[in-house]
Every structure is written in C-alpha cells, then in structure tokens.
Design a protein with these regions (language model features):
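Active-site phosphate-binding/coordination module
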Residues: 1-25
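Generic structural signal of hydrophobic/aromatic residues within well-ordered alpha-helices
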Residues: 6, 51, 55, 67, ...
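Short, conserved catalytic or adaptor-binding loops enriched in Gly and charged residues
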Residues: 8, 72-77, 142-144
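Conserved acidic, metal-coordinating active-site core of Asp-based
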Residues: 16-120, 127-131
C-alpha cells in the first residue's frame, strides 16, 4: 500500500517521496525529501507551511487532508482500511494507528490493575497541523485513555488538544521524567 501511495504521488502529482521505513503494519513516507532536519527528530516550525506550498505546487490543493484521503483511498483499492496521519515531513500509514495501540495496551494493563489514570502519554506530534487535523500523537487520546496525563515535548507553536500539557525540551524532558520515576 505504501509503495502504491509513493508511486501515485510521483506519477499523478509529480511529488517525489521516499519510504523511509516499513513494518508489517505501518510505514512512514518522507514528503519533503529535499528538506533535511539536520538531526532534529521533531517537526520544525516552518515545515507545515513549506509542505502546504509543495502540495499546492503538485496539484494537491486541499493540503494534508487531501493527502490523507489519497492514502486512505489507496488502501481501499487493496481492500484494506488504513489509518493515515502526518507530522508535515512524514505521512504515516498503517492498518492501525496510535489510538488502536493505546487502547490495546490499556486493555492489557487492566488485567494488572493499571488504569489510564496511572498512565502518562508522551509525544512530540500533538500540534494542530491544519484546521482540526492534529499530529499523530493526538491519536493517543481516546475514550479509554482520556483519564491519563498527556505531555508534549515539542516546543513548536500551535494549538493542541485541550488535555495536552506542553513541556518542550525534547527527548531530554522525557528521559528526565523516566529517571525521576526510578
């Protein structure tokens, strides 16, 4: 499915992409192959606008929502419902998403007496990247997980789901949290 998305974007839109990794149930497609983050793991502040310009140049006028629609329609052609999210540089496509994963973990934790209230959910992709389209980490907020605590280690400006607390500091903030739990 990811290869088909990659080919469709190239042939029909002239948009060069690269599949940066692929797992049995998930892949990540680099939408801005010319844009090197220079070792930065997190979405950079100017990437969303830069991607919007790239998409428009290639005839994807409605932006990221249209791109996600292309991914979902491609999955349907293979008889597979896929979930697609984006952090600007990468289109993430899978047969499940972070919502599914969080809910499965919480079900398993329940047997150990661990509830969502005992959990915290950390990420760097909560920010709204288009109107009412949030980054992939926002999918961790589900009906089952909403009683937990949500933290964003990205310092990028923008709206986030109401439950998310912005801490910034990148990976170091998360590592400090883990060390303090020991």
């Amino acid at each position: 499915i990811c290869y088909a998305i990659h080919v469709k974007l190239l042939w029909e839109y002239g948009l060069k992409t690269d599949i940066v990794f692929s797992r049995p149930n998930y892949c990540k497609i680099d939408l801005m192959v010319e844009n090197d983050r220079g070792g930065q793991l997190f979405m950079q502040g100017d990437e969303v606008e830069h991607l919007r310009q790239i998409l428009k140049q290639h005839g994807i006028e409605s932006g990221l929502k249209e791109l996600i629609g292309i991914a979902e329609q491609t999955g349907e052609k293979f008889g597979q419902r896929v979930s697609a999210t984006c952090d600007a540089k990468y289109l993430e496509v899978g047969i499940s998403c972070k919502s599914d994963n969080v809910d499965v973990f919480l079900e398993r934790f329940k047997a150990e007496g661990i509830t969502a209230e005992d959990c915290s959910f950390w990420g760097d992709e909560f920010v709204e990247i288009e109107h009412e389209l949030y980054g992939s980490d926002s999918f961790m907020y589900t009906e089952k997980s909403k009683a937990g605590d949500f933290f964003d280690v990205s310092a990028i400006e923008g709206n986030r789901p109401e439950a998310v607390k912005v801490l910034g500091g990148g990976v170091e903030t998360f590592l400090t949290f883990l060390k303090e739990q020991a």
